[in-house]
Amino acid sequence: MFNCIEGVENKIFHGINLKYYSNKLEDLKIFEEIIKSRKIMSRNDLIKMRYEHFECLPRIYEQCENEICFAMHPKNKNFSSVYCNDDSLSAFYEYIRFNISFVFLESILNNGYSLQDGGEIRIPTSLDIDKDLVAIGCFDEIEYLLEKVNRGKSKNVMFSEQLIKCEDIHKYISEKKKRTYIIKNLLKKYGYNVPIIDPLTGNIIDSNYEKNIEDVKLLKKVLIKNI
């Protein structure tokens, strides 16, 4: 049983970023609509189908009515020239961090794309997701923050207020597990056989996996100290 997907740094990501939605639709609802339709749609296509939540669409779609926005992995060497030294300013962290994402093979770029600053990629068409989808990404926030702390870089980390303010670590982890479980069930419901991964590392996330409580308590102390 493998525990990660190979070559995650060469994959292309499309993320559900709730900060672009005007009335904060639940990302699980948007996720289900996408996997049910089996298509990531451009603004034009959403207009044609009279998309129920059109008024709540991300502003990002207004950049071009036919484009869809993606992000490359910050370790993608083929496009490293468009990244700045601060990973946190990249499209990957802007669109993928804390959000559900769709992970695709690089072959989705074969029909043309435009490359923007910060590792953003725009594809000039709607995308059928069955062919090139290899995984669903759920950012493993705790693993990411622990790795930063262990490397002595906690002062520069983009901490999570949700984690810091959470009084009950067990409840926090339980909610993370519940979310992964819901995503896994939705994938099964609509006939998808792809893993759920941490998009940064490619590690497969098991809905039964529980982070070490003491590690998370230590992490909270470090983050609070550096606010």
Language-model segments: which ranges?
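NAD-dependent ADP-ribosyltransferases
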Residues: 1-227
